[in-house]
A protein has these predicted regions:
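C-terminal motif of bacterial Sec signal peptides marking the signal peptidase cleavage site
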Residues: 24-27
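Feature for extracytoplasmic/surface-facing segments of secreted or surface-associated proteins
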Residues: 30-215
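N-terminal secretory signal peptides that target proteins for export/translocation
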Residues: 1-10
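Sec-dependent N-terminal signal peptides
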Residues: 11-20
C-alpha cells in the first residue's frame, strides 16, 4: 500500500523538490548579485574621492628701505604687520606685498629680501616721479626729521594720518604733489598731533637720499 502511495505522489514530490532547489539557487544568485553591486558601489565611491591637499606657502622675511623704514603696514597674502626698526616685513613667496601708512597705500609689488620705493611702482626707477614722491612722503613722516639714521614713523603719526581719511596719488609731477591738498592736509594733521614742525621734504633732498639708499 505504501508503495502504491509513493508511486502515486512521486511526480508531485519531484516537482516540489525541483521548486525548492531552484528557489535556493535563485536566492544565492540574488545575494551574490547584491554583494557584487555593493562592492562595485564601494569601489566607485573610493575612486571618486579626491584628496583635499592645500599646497604649502613659503613665508620669508624682507626689509623695506629708504634707509630702514619702521612703522609702515604691510600685507602679503595671510601675512600682515608693521615694519620694525630694521624695516623688516614678512611675505608669501610668489605673491604680492602692499605697503601703507595710516590707511594711505604707498605702493605694492612682487616681494623680495630687500625693497625700496623703486620696487613698489610699476616700471619704477630712481628717477620715476611716483617713486620720488613716495620717498618725499616717507621722509616727511620721519619722527626725528633725519632719514640718514633711519625713518621711524610712530603710531601717533599713523593715527593722525588715519583720522584724515585721505588717499594720496603719488603718480603726479613734483609741483602737483607739493600743492596737493590731500598731501598738505596729512602733513598739517601730523604736525598738530605730534606737536612738532613738519614740512614736506623737497624733491631734490628726497631724491638724493633715495639714491644713496639704492646704491
Amino acid at each position: 500500500m505504501y508503495l502504491i502511495l509513493i508511486k502515486k505522489y512521486q511526480y508531485n514530490l519531484l516537482l516540489i523538490l525541483m521548486v525548492v532547489v531552484v528557489s535556493l539557487m535563485l536566492g544565492c544568485d540574488s545575494d551574490y548579485t547584491q554583494d557584487d553591486s555593493n562592492l562595485n558601489s564601494a569601489l566607485s565611491s573610493d575612486t571618486d574621492i579626491t584628496p583635499n591637499i592645500t599646497p604649502s606657502v613659503s613665508v620669508k622675511s624682507g626689509s623695506f628701505k629708504d634707509s630702514a623704514v619702521a612703522g609702515i603696514n604691510y600685507v602679503s597674502g595671510g601675512e600682515t604687520g608693521t615694519t620694525d626698526s630694521d624695516g623688516t616685513f614678512k611675505y608669501e613667496e610668489g605673491g604680492t606685498v602692499t605697503f601703507s601708512v595710516g590707511g594711505v597705500v604707498i605702493g605694492s609689488g612682487p616681494p623680495s629680501a630687500e625693497m625700496t620705493p623703486v620696487d613698489i611702482v610699476d616700471g619704477g626707477s630712481e628717477d620715476n616721479q611716483a617713486v620720488v614722491n613716495i620717498a618725499r612722503f616717507l621722509q616727511t613722516l620721519d619722527d626725528d626729521g633725519d632719514p640718514t639714521n633711519g625713518i621711524g614713523i610712530s603710531s601717533t603719526t599713523s593715527e593722525a594720518i588715519k583720522t584724515t581719511g585721505k588717499s594720496i596719488d603719488f603718480n603726479v609731477d613734483a609741483t602737483s604733489f607739493s600743492e596737493n591738498t590731500d598731501v598738505l592736509d596729512v602733513v598739517q594733521k601730523v604736525a598738530t598731533q605730534t606737536g612738532r614742525e613738519v614740512e614736506l621734504v623737497s624733491e631734490t633732498k628726497a631724491k638724493s637720499h633715495l639714491q644713496n639708499t639704492v646704491m
